[in-house]
Amino acid sequence: MLRHLQVARVSGLCFWSGTMLAAPFEQRLEAAVAGGFTSISVFPMDCPDTRRAHALRSMSEARGVRIGALDPFTRWLPGWQAPKGIAPEFLALVGCEADAFFETAEALGATSMTVLEPFGRRHGMGELVEGFAAVCDRAARSGIRVHLEFTPFSGIPDLETAFEIVCGADRANGGLVFDTWHYLRGRPDASLLETIPGPRIFVVQVSDAAREPVGSLVEDTMFNRRLPGEGDWDLEGLLAALLSKPGLGEVGIEVLSRSLMRLGPREIGSRCGEALRRLLDEAGARLPV
């Protein structure tokens, strides 16, 4: 155990909807309630209009779950265009137009939003910084925080690149998503992680995995993640290092798994909540009451 480290109180526990990517929002909310999560993320495709967004907000509040992030926003860089042959269901997930995205975020009462680059296109650092800063400025008018997510198969492939963008933009409402899968399957850099201030890591997304990828990286991240404690990674050590940072944000779970999706919503939520709390307890975290 690593309880000798001074760790921060976890501000909340988020059920990231990617865990039940193919399920309707109502089932994801049922899972979040069953797992004792304090917040839930929403996809833009969940809300074809603001009326639906208001309905999801009311539904969540009635169950005692706050809507946290609207995830993801991808139309923030020059030349956004979906590649030929992209699956329609993936385009529905990532293709939301900017005005519609921000209208939805406001209607939901979302407190944050995720920004990522979905197609693996490379951009100069100047374009990345300028684009991220512009998103932060627009979001700030609605009191929304913006967290940038890196993925090893995207145009923002690692923590180093993402942190450089966040630092270059230098916006108070701009920070990072730290997804354990993306970090450990990419270029993990403990020395760099140690230098990043806790307040710049807005959210932590937790999942475990096999030591080596099962299939391609995309297949591994979309279908073969595991619950914390069911894989081969030292998540306890990683979480303890993260939680030792003063001002670290919310911690949540995002486990995209074929085997998990065979279960019902309540069992998925319960297993996710139990696994995440067990890991946080082992890492020495003080959980929200």
Where are these predicted regions, by residue range?
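Active-site acidic/histidine proton-transfer and metal-coordination neighborhood
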Residues: 5, 24-26, 81-175, 286
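Active-site beta-loop-alpha junctions enriched in small/polar residues
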Residues: 16-20, 43-47, 72-75, 118-120, ...
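Alpha-helix-loop-beta-strand connector modules within alpha/beta enzyme cores
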Residues: 57-74, 129-140, 169, 233-238
